[in-house]
């Protein structure tokens, strides 16, 4: 997926006192075999399952795996690198060992640290066999592209790549081997390998701690991922996917569409570039494993997200139409009038969408049923664009660059509020400030504040004071020793 995964903290010596060690052990047992795909090599299959193209190809018109895609992070944009076998701008000169180090440990051939927008904390448990297959695929089947990708230039202190080595220790990013769990069958083990390693689902769906390392106590319980919300996919019946049928889960992962859910944002990209191409047996294995994930309930959720239906519409369409006109639409903040103007032609005045389901119902929809409204806000701001089975699903964006109807933060807030109260979870509310935050890329994480001028000044002042204290302490010790020897 194309949103930020964990990013380094600056080098903090105090953290090192609490840190563990980073040790790589080799797997002793193979993973369950994937479903048979005779039309492609195993390495090609693994590249699809690992979703390499989503980040390393710059949009639908970009050159395959040539990098250049801007991955949004709290510290700034991180540009994906060229991983074609180009010997001038790609990884064509990498040995298998160097490729493995980059993939599993985030260390380039020149020894520099890779930013963890690359999910090496998930890939570090890939088996040796799979790493070799991926290497063979990239080196022999991918077309080399002799073109550079933009350089990542993050603000200080995040521009210091060496600090990533300290972050890996402090955040306990360890290369633990994959171990086959003999208490479960092959299907479950294959599902776990796909979810935790290849598809790296936890990179988005597991929340992060202060150091932006995965908080495993809330494994797959949902997290903010840039402007979007990666939902809870534990087996919780109200907060997660516990009320979904196996068929619904299978269909959603394969197509991005069910009667009560539609994929958008990073999840739409994962389905478009990766999941839709996996064999049915592998999708079923993912469903099997997800069914075993312990439920993590969220406070305030009393029914499943798709069981909310808001309240019956209390306004007259005619009255709403009379309160707006093309000349006043840009200024109105009447939620009903705005909904009727920019939403109802597809989703209908009653919010139930088209009869054939092409335009989804907003009633009984997981996006409108969440307590966290970020996905609804982001869908309005950025639209929906996914292609599955060579069929594109498109909802226009209504953000500032909209070609259809640019809306202000306040207008988007009133539309979202109207949708939630009439068709979704009436407990959720949206403010103009919430829209502004989503538009800006989501909540600022505490570590990102290290790059602010005020914090840098404070850290700099603290460093100077610390140096003065150290010098003063040394002077005192030397003076004391001289007095004793006198």
Swiss-Prot record:
Q: Which residues bind heme c 3?
A: 343, 346-347
Q: Name one GO cellular component term.
A: plasma membrane
Q: What keywords is this UniProt entry annotated with?
A: Cell membrane, Heme, Iron, Membrane, Metal-binding, Repeat, Signal, Transmembrane, Transmembrane helix
- Annotated signal sequence is 1-25
**Binding-site list for heme c 2:** 201, 204-205
Q: Does the keyword Transmembrane apply?
A: yes
Which terms in the Gene Ontology molecular function aspect does this entry carry? electron transfer activity; heme binding; iron ion binding; oxidoreductase activity, acting on CH-OH group of donors
What use has been found for this protein in biotech? Answer: This enzyme is commonly used in a number of research projects to examine the electrochemical properties of enzyme-catalyzed electrode reactions, named bioelectrocatalysis. Available as a commercial product from Sigma Aldrich (catalog number F4892).
* Main localization, broad class: membrane
User: Cross-referenced Pfam families, in alphabetical order?
Assistant: Cytochrom_C (PF00034), Cytochrome_CBB3 (PF13442)
**Recorded topology in the membrane:** Single-pass type I membrane protein
User: Transmembrane ranges?
Assistant: 458-478
Where does the record place it?
Cell membrane
Q: What are the binding positions for heme c 1 in this chain? A: 52, 55-56
**InterPro entries annotated for this entry?**
Cyt_c-like_dom, Cyt_c-like_dom_sf, Cytochrome_c-type_DH, Membr-bd_ADH_cyt_c
**Domain Cytochrome c, residue spans:** 38-142, 186-294, 330-423
Q: Which GO terms describe its biological process?
A: fructose metabolic process
In what way is this protein post-translationally modified? Binds 3 heme c groups covalently per subunit.
Q: What does this protein do?
A: Cytochrome subunit of fructose dehydrogenase, an enzyme that catalyzes the oxidation of D-fructose to produce 5-keto-D-fructose. In the complex, mediates both the electron transfer to ubiquinone and the anchoring of the complex to the membrane.
- Description of how the protein assembles with itself and partners: Heterotrimer composed of FdhL, FdhS and FdhC.
Q: What is this protein called?
A: Fructose dehydrogenase cytochrome subunit
What gene is this protein translated from? fdhC
